[in-house]
Amino acid sequence: MTAFKSDFLNILQERGFIHQCSDFEGLDALAAKGEATAYVGYDCTARSLHIGNYLTMMMLHWLQQSGNKPITLMGGGTTMVGDPSGKDETRAMRTVAEIEANKESIRGVFAKVLRYGDGKSDAVMLDNAEWLTKLNWIEMLRDVGRHFSVNRMLTMDSVRLRLEREQEMSFIEFNYMVCQAYDFVELAKRTGCKLQMGGSDQWGNIIMGVDLGRRMGTHQLFALTTPLLTTASGAKMGKTAQGAVWLNADQFSPYDFWQYWRNTEDADVGKFLKLFTTLPMSEIGKLEALGGSEINEAKKVLATEATALLHGRDAANEAAETARRTFEEGALAESLPTVEIPRGELDAGFGVLNAFVKAGLVASNGEARRQIKGGGLRVNDEPVTDDKMALSAAHLTPEGVIKLSFGKKKHILIKPA
């Protein structure tokens, strides 16, 4: 393990955040002086960011904790173009109104892990629409475009893989890397930002910005990326039967967030404690050393600390208590996630397969049938044995809900609206 001069790189290294860096020595010297102003860009493609974005948010958190300045760059401009990285087909074009709505929905989450203000290491939030939407086409081609080699652009994974598969790539997508590179140079001029961070899939785009800065006479710029986030079994992290693990509470409840971490594979507990909590490394070391059934206690700590960081300590403790009552006492907890269905549908008989799909506990009717055969689905704690069963008002508990369960740990309440 390399010993760095800066707290920033030492923290990232011991916690497992580092995948690639364009110049460790130069960045280390900059960070040691508290001059490593850095940014991460977040496109506004959805109403919420997801768990993959949370990883880079934690990098910004540790940057700030080590005395350097973080910038969160909202992609109001780049979202109009669409990042082709990791995509097999062109992204759907979003209207300006949709992008603005997404941006407003997203922006509040950053203050959960960053301190904003006017101080030397206080975070700032900018939007690349401020400069990208004002660019003159001819000036852009002459002043910026001439520094890009199409030969090199064709070797980037986001482009090369599409071409190898004979999948269409639009001209607007092809220009995404130009926009991202220009962002880096513009931020360097405006704020003195010298570091861009991102996921490993962004390495090529970030390096384009480093090179553009050199060609346009900007100070030396740096690139730093995180590893691809996967579980010990090799699966891409961040998906559940309900879909993506969103960061906004109205799209993925604190209880679901807590449960997501509680269900971590044994081999991943230590890694995720380092990446998604701020617990001291000494405490994480003790939790990593737990074995057998004791590893479940470490999972509860992971779930509570990760949830507290994003949703607050009260929400984390409430989620932990709800889980304890539900799983240890078998109680029907009112704070379980709830899905509403029209009262008329329930009165007419709501198919049990449809109910489990609508609740997000299974992905399809076929999966629901397979789980019923295996005894994995329950209604009000009673096993479902007939896939033609219909839920009705007769299934409502005294609390006016129907409890659906998948296995021992996944529960949803159905409530007539």
UniProtKB/Swiss-Prot annotation:
Q: Which domain of life, per UniProt?
A: Bacteria
Q: Where does L-tyrosine bind?
A: Y39, Y176, Q180
User: Motif 'HIGH' region: which residue numbers?
Assistant: 44-53
Which InterPro entries did the record assign? aa-tRNA-synth_Ic, Rossmann-like_a/b/a_fold, S4_RNA-bd_sf, SYY-like_C, Tyr-tRNA-ligase, Tyr-tRNA-ligase_bac-type, Tyr-tRNA-ligase_bac_1
How is this protein annotated for GO cellular component?
Answer: cytosol
Q: Name one GO molecular function term.
A: RNA binding
Q: Which reaction does it catalyse?
A: tRNA(Tyr) + L-tyrosine + ATP = L-tyrosyl-tRNA(Tyr) + AMP + diphosphate + H(+)
Residues reported to bind ATP = K239
State the compartments where it is located: Cytoplasm
Q: Does the keyword Aminoacyl-tRNA synthetase apply?
A: yes
Alphabetized NCBIfam families for the sequence: tyrS
Q: Give the UniProt family note.
A: Belongs to the class-I aminoacyl-tRNA synthetase family. TyrS type 1 subfamily.
- What task does this protein carry out? Catalyzes the attachment of tyrosine to tRNA(Tyr) in a two-step reaction: tyrosine is first activated by ATP to form Tyr-AMP and then transferred to the acceptor end of tRNA(Tyr).
How this chain assembles, per its entry, is: Homodimer.
- HAMAP family noted in UniProt: Tyr_tRNA_synth_type1 (MF_02006)
Q: What is this protein called?
A: Tyrosine--tRNA ligase
Q: Which organism is it from?
A: Bradyrhizobium diazoefficiens (strain JCM 10833 / BCRC 13528 / IAM 13628 / NBRC 14792 / USDA 110)
